[in-house]
């Protein structure tokens, strides 16, 4: 694997909440969250670190958040404001490179391999970008610098908030070897438990494993996991890459076999889907979204999908799809449920995060 790329992953710190606090300094030092109202089954879009001390996090239901933190200051989502600030941040990015891959309004990959500023040092470039953002917008950000995309993303979380972390090419092998598998994107709680049962805790453990076993146990994801654990990630930073859909899927903590249980999962996924639509679809009307889909993966690792064009994306539309696709179960247990919504092509104006 060639490690000659210089990739920076920039992640704004508590982006929406930080903008609100910047615009209203009286909120500083208080637990603040941005999200929907509790009586409307809302969820938190983001919250600041004061709120996180109470165990609050993005995508948590607002009602649960208020139980944990009764003094929480809950602010409505102001997407037009966040988009405007995001564009200001991207203007700063473009001073250093045109190779920018936005992940969401508050997160992006930058390829600065060809950048000559600051003697071509990706570390100094990242520091300069973060300094520009702070001086001009009074917002903090964190950065990860590495020759591979997946490592840059992991690195950006190492010194949050308002910090950065560098993984040099010559450090990749040692860093990856000791990297906990739970740090890798896609290794959720269920996958982590399964890996632990097989004796895999770090990437180094996977390096000593049989490749066929990893592929057999984890399918397509196992191929990516194997590559990452061996310091392989050929993905380029892709500017202006339009995505056509947004989805939510999770492997369940335990397999289920009743429609009632599946309906509860769909209802939970639907709230997460709305949360992600807030971040990625913005303030455009949800009525523009007509095509939805559902996916079931069974305990024999086969899967089936069903898509429909509807008159909206209300919760009951997904529940209807579930009832229709349920007939395909044929006695098998369900290990994964996924929901997705397709974006009209003429509405796609920027990259959207798929299966985020």
Curated annotation (Swiss-Prot):
Tell me which UniProt keywords the record has, alphabetically: Cytoplasm, DNA damage, DNA repair, DNA replication, DNA-binding, DNA-directed DNA polymerase, Magnesium, Metal-binding, Mutator protein, Nucleotidyltransferase, Transferase
Main localization (coarse): cytoplasm
InterPro entries xref list: DNA/RNA_pol_sf, DNA_pol_Y-fam_lit_finger_sf, DNA_pol_Y-fam_little_finger, DNA_polymerase-Y, DNApol_IV, IMS_HHH_1, Rev_trsase/Diguanyl_cyclase, UmuC
Active-site positions on this chain: 107
Q: Which reaction does it catalyse?
A: DNA(n) + a 2'-deoxyribonucleoside 5'-triphosphate = DNA(n+1) + diphosphate
Give the enzyme's EC designation: 2.7.7.7
Q: What note does UniProt attach to the cofactor annotation? A: Binds 2 magnesium ions per subunit.
Q: Where is this site: Substrate discrimination?
A: 16
Q: Which Pfam families match?
A: IMS, IMS_C, IMS_HHH_1
Can you state the subunit structure given in the record? Monomer.
Family per similarity comment: Belongs to the DNA polymerase type-Y family.
**PANTHER family, per this entry?**
DNA POLYMERASE KAPPA (PTHR11076:SF33), DNA REPAIR POLYMERASE UMUC / TRANSFERASE FAMILY MEMBER (PTHR11076)
Report the protein's function.
Poorly processive, error-prone DNA polymerase involved in untargeted mutagenesis. Copies undamaged DNA at stalled replication forks, which arise in vivo from mismatched or misaligned primer ends. These misaligned primers can be extended by PolIV. Exhibits no 3'-5' exonuclease (proofreading) activity. May be involved in translesional synthesis, in conjunction with the beta clamp from PolIII.
Q: What is this protein called?
A: DNA polymerase IV
The record lists the organism as Glaesserella parasuis serovar 5 (strain SH0165)
